[in-house]
């Protein structure tokens, strides 16, 4: 069994050290194997300029947050997935780090940027990866990646048992969509969302929906947090459940795939719908006899 969970809270915009300290204070009090933190938990979400995003971004793995979380992970023998803005050369990325008892492991850069994120960040261009952390194999995705079912499918095909999903959800459909993603791939998912709202620089107010959750491979919501309260939740799961892809004795989720029919999924210029149809000739019916 594996003890997994999330920390849902309201990060203070621009207060990197305060946000990191709050996380360390809370995680220091629990016993867990894997904890997921929200997207951009160090910085907050609603940037008003690229310069502001650059100022709050950090290098990975040598930046402040990765170093502090690595110290915690070593002390607690803990794996952590945490979202933060990353600065790499002249590029900025909406990233998530994977940290373990031996320190920094890897980074995932968000593939599908949402709304004004496109003004500050570059989309991630690395392959979707799965990491073996001993008792489980995990993949990472960030927030709006949920809108694209291909992400979880690829991670699942690569053997992921658990999908770690840092998020700053503002759309209401994400939590329920993740239930479907888990069911259609037979994997666990841990969504770590934030609460509160941000309204900066005269921009539209963003209200974050909370509802962080852990979902099972059968689509069962094992736990869903509130919409507006800070919560640190840890529960036990058996990652081996995610390796049972049989739906029944005649159907296997992955073996039954018809990849010969799916070519359009990777075609940047999919075929247009058929517009011409062959009309059947009308046959004249004889008049009924009286």
Predicted segment positions?
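C-terminal beta-strand edge segments of enzyme domains
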Residues: 130-132, 194-290
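Extreme N-terminal starter segment of soluble prokaryotic enzymes
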Residues: 1-6
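Short polar catalytic/cofactor-binding loops
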Residues: 8-14
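CN hydrolase (nitrilase-like) catalytic-core segments centered on the catalytic cysteine
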Residues: 64-79, 147-233
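Active-site neighborhood of phospho(di)ester-bond hydrolases with catalytic His/Asp-centered motifs
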Residues: 35-39, 80-84, 108, 141-142, ...
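Active-site catalytic loop in hydrolytic enzyme cores
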Residues: 87-158, 167, 173-180, 208, ...
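Short amphipathic alpha-helical segment that frequently serves as the phosphate-/nucleotide-binding helix
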Residues: 16-26
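Cys-nucleophile CN-hydrolase/nitrilase-fold catalytic domain and related Cys-dependent amidase chemistry
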Residues: 24-105, 170-185
């Amino acid at each position: 069994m594996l003890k997994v969970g999330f920390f849902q809270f309201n990060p203070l915009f621009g207060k990197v050290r305060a946000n990191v300290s709050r996380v360390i204070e809370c995680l220091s009090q629990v016993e867990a194997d894997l904890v997921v933190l929200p997207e951009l938990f160090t910085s907050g979400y609603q940037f008003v300029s690229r310069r502001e995003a650059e100022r709050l971004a950090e290098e990975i793995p040598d930046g402040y947050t990765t170093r502090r979380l690595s110290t915690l992970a070593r002390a607690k023998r803990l794996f952590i997935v945490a979202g933060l803005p990353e600065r790499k050369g002249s590029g900025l990325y909406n990233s998530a780090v994977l940290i373990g008892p031996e320190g920094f492991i890897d980074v995932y850069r968000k593939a599908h940027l949402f709304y004004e994120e496109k003004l500050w960040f570059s989309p991630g261009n690395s392959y979707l990866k799965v990491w073996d952390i001993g008792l489980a194999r995990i993949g990472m995705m960030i927030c709006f990646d949920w809108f694209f079912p291909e992400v979880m499918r690829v991670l699942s095909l690569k053997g992921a048992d658990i999908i770690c999903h840092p998020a700053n959800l503002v759309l209401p459909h994400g939590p329920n969509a993740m239930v479907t993603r888990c069911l259609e791939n037979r994997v666990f998912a841990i969504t770590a969302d934030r609460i509160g709202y941000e309204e900066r620089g005269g921009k539209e107010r963003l209200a974050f929906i909370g509802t962080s959750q852990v979902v099972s491979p059968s689509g069962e919501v094992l736990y869903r947090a509130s919409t507006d309260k800070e919560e640190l939740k840890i529960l036990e799961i058996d990652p081996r459940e995610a390796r049972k892809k049989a739906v029944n004795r005649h159907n296997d989720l992955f073996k039954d795939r018809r990849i010969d029919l799916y070519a359009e999924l990777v075609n940047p210029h999919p075929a247009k719908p058929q517009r011409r149809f062959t009309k059947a000739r009308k046959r004249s019916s004889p008049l009924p006899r009286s």
